[in-house]
Amino acid sequence: GDVYKRQGWNYLMSTLPNSIILNYGDNDTFPLWNNQEIYGVRPDVRIMNTSYLGGEWYIDEMKTKANDAPGVPFSLPKSKYTFTNDWVPVDNRFDRAVDIKDVIEFVRSEDPRSKIKLSDGTMTDYIPTKRIALPVNKENAIASGIVAEKDRAQMVDTVYINLRKNSIDKTQLMILDMLANFDWKRPLYMTQVYILQDFGLMDYLQFDGYAYRFVPILTPVQNPWEIGRIDADYAAPLLKETFRYGNLADPRVYADYFIQYNLSASHARDAFARVAKELLRQDRAQEAVELLDMGLEKLPPSQIRFTDSNTYPFLEAYYAASAMGVEDAADKGDALLREYARTLIEYIEYYLRFDGVQGDMVSPIIDEKLDQLGDVYYLAVYAGRKEIIGEINAYYRSLGVEEENLVDVGDKPHQVDTTLIPRKDTAQ
């Protein structure tokens, strides 16, 4: 339980004062409730479990004050969410963006013209557009801390919501209602980015080390590992001083599957590399390396299993810091890369022992691990780490990889000993 308690603490502590944090499912809700209700952590934050928002009783509860947090700013009356509107059709009647307040007003209206007929003949509320305009109150966004003063110029005038499906559920209707009424006075956070996926809002996030802040700054998602912009001045102190990881670094502590899964889902170790990379972009290379070291110290690979997303960015950042002149950064990168490559090779060797039907079953895993090994191999090539390239070359040769497919670092054998090469076809 210690790990989950810390996880709840980290989510709450990553948020700005007076925030609303939207959770998804049990694993990232109960730890926050535990911290807040039992230990009095961050009573100013309103925790809202989106999995419950389909229930009218929960919407009613969310409208009320809890601890030191005012209610969630919903405006729709009970008649619009009690035993009705479990699903709301989206019918694209306008080819332009409609203001979000007008959309909610349309749903609130009892005018028959604001209804649509379903296939069974019943009339129901609907959303008349897929594209919704959410105007940005820039002064409020600065005053509430949603946007730092230094980032004022990066704010957009309007955030555009793009509904991706032909209907939304009650949870999404209530989130739209909240967006129409929060007026940028209270920071909104998500524990999981996917809460905003169906609204097309993934490009308006900021990763604050644990939770994601909804911001009026456009940051297009380039890859799934790096969703959201980063404000290093906000996130670095949290990672260094505020967040807690319990005694996970103690080898006597068993990090079971659920701990591994939850730390992976919350990007706990990846966060250090992501913020370090932002520091590198600001020419703060020494600080970046300190952060990388701390991430591996608090959440060591010996405890928290390697994944490509919690390892590869560390390697990139160490080698980049080395190129920027930080003394031992490349050596640290080498040590981590060797440990990771050794683990990948152990996986590959283990799965290569299977043949027949079992061999077929594990071949996708072999392909995945070979891909990951290839990624770090080419990173080593890019960073000019000849010794490591030679070590991985030797392994590739044992798999029967042809010389022309290997990067030559002056390690070609004069005569290949053919006894090494015959291998099962699974290595293809």
Regions found by a protein language model. Give the residues of each.
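ER/secretory pathway lumenal C-terminal domains and tails of membrane proteins involved
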Residues: 2-18, 30-428
